[in-house]
A protein has these predicted regions:
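C-terminal non-catalytic regions of proteins with extracellular/luminal or membrane-system context
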Residues: 1-328
């Protein structure tokens, strides 16, 4: 933050506190906006160029030119988009998220997509921050922008907390609690989908090479449940269980070594998934059964133990025994 000479703060959620669904206030006096949070962190000599660019809902693009100029005059641009939510009885006309506010299309609302693309075309590095309570279709953003952060509705200290992450005071460690689809047409999309008689998704398509699952796309999520990145890196090894066979009342104790191989102290969410290898019933391709969040210093290694009661894996079948394979989801 101290080395930046200029930064563009852009977007409909840049100077607005989003407290979340069922919250009574939308007044910025009750919280810290992202714009204010960033101003609190940067050097006093850093130039802040703010431009709203567009609203969350309107198709009016007249403010985009100002945002483009702000980006051109800055070393980096941070765009705050997403959605808005509040108490059902207050300011409901500007809500795009929450109970009773469903979107028929999960593309970013209003002129947000155009704003992002025109700022991107300036050549200034762009960070997209989604302040939202729902997933959006952001495949273009994923393929073109160097960084995307999802903040959700962070409440009163939202501006200070996102500034801490943007400037490296805090290393991000969140994991998605639902999946982001590639398009609205890809819904429903789950991490724990049921396989068809063709098994796993093996033949995704593209315009250059049409496939079968989707002719011109992959049926998998753009970002799946459990996904999340960090400023540091982790390596897993020596996954093992305490026994090879278990009785009905037993609990599986699985251990794995996790090492922080990066330069920063960071938190990792160790996730244990299971998959039924053979069954007379159709079961999900994988299911999350346990997780633990740990903090490791650079170079530090820790053995993590995860537990799964056999009762959580029950499939009632008197004649055919079943076996499971342990999987882990580590996508940093």
């Amino acid at each position: 933050a101290k080395s930046l000479k200029s930064i563009a703060i852009i977007g409909p959620n840049a100077d607005q506190v989003q407290f979340g669904d069922y919250t009574w206030s939308r007044n910025n006096k009750d919280g810290v906006t992202p714009l204010q949070g960033i101003k609190n962190r940067v050097n006093k000599n850093t130039a802040i160029h703010y431009a709203k660019g567009c609203s969350l809902t309107s198709l009016d693009t007249s403010g985009i030119a100002e945002a483009v100029e702000a980006a051109k005059n800055s070393e980096v641009a941070v765009i705050f988009g997403g959605s808005a939510s509040a108490a059902l009885a207050r300011d409901y006309k500007s809500s795009t998220c929450g109970e009773g506010f469903d979107l028929n299309d999960l593309n970013l609302t209003g002129a947000q997509s155009q704003l992002i693309r025109e700022v991107y075309r300036t050549g200034t590095p762009v960070i997209l921050v989604l302040v939202t309570g729902k997933p959006f279709v952001i495949e273009w953003e994923k393929n073109n922008l160097p960084a995307i952060l999802v903040q959700w509705y962070a409440g009163e200290q939202a501006g200070n907390s996102i500034a801490d992450i943007l400037f490296g005071e805090v290393v991000p460690s969140g994991r998605l609690t639902f999946s982001f689809p590639r398009s609205t047409g890809h819904l429903p999309v789950y991490y724990n989908y049921l396989p068809s008689d063709r098994g796993f998704y093996k033949n995704p398509g593209s315009y250059d090479s049409p496939g079968r699952d989707y002719v011109f796309s992959a049926p998998s999520a753009l970002y799946s449940f459990g996904y999340g990145l960090s400023y540091t890196s982790f390596v897993y090894k020596n996954l093992s269980t305490d026994k090879d066979k278990y009785e009905l009342n037993d609990t599986i104790h699985a251990t794995v070594e996790v090492k922080n191989t990066g330069k920063y102290t960071g938190k990792e969410v160790v996730q244990l998934y299971v998959r039924d290898k053979a069954s007379t019933y159709v079961t999900p391709v994988k299911q999350l059964r346990d997780f633990k969040k740990i903090e490791l210093a650079p170079g530090e290694t820790r053995t993590v133990q995860l537990q799964v009661p056999i009762s959580d894996l029950y499939l009632v079948d008197e004649k055919n025994p079943v076996s499971y394979t342990h999987l882990r989801a580590h996508e940093t």
